[in-house]
Amino acid sequence: MKVLLLNGSPRKEGCTFTALSEVAKTLNHNGIDTEIFQAGNPDTDNVKAAAAKLKEADALIVGSPVYWASPSGQIIEFMDKLCSMAGKDMLHKPAAAVASARRAGTTATLDVLQKYFSYHEMPVVSANYWNMVHGNTPAEVAQDEEGLQIMRSLGNNMAW
């Protein structure tokens, strides 16, 4: 099994990456291959590259920072293009969304991202709480013990 994780932040190794890395580490521990793909650049060639990887993946996790109580504009544009190009390759694959915020807006962000999954008949994988981490820097996210535990729970549930 292989899981493709899309980092919807324009910051390659920021807070969203930190959260996705925790999920990937847990998936790897369960014997599942992972790849974190930098989706913070919605350039069409970048989306095409992700579409090729999605075709080979068995599951998808989409992570985004929270901007104005919503996913980043970059990941929205990226997902709009990806669904147009590769929607057929999304059908029935397990999926999950991850939100990273300094404070608030995470549940609204998760709701927007999960609409892409619902439309493509993707079973949504959850954790023992909302899939979110809190912090303004990767170091702060690394101190969010509850958030990181949620990421590990998500990884274990995706592996199941």
Residue ranges, per PLM feature:
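Short, glycine-/small-residue-rich phosphate/pyrophosphate-handling segment
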Residues: 91-134, 145-150
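N-terminal beta1-alpha1-beta2 submodule of the flavodoxin-like/Rossmannoid cofactor-binding fold
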Residues: 1-87, 138-160
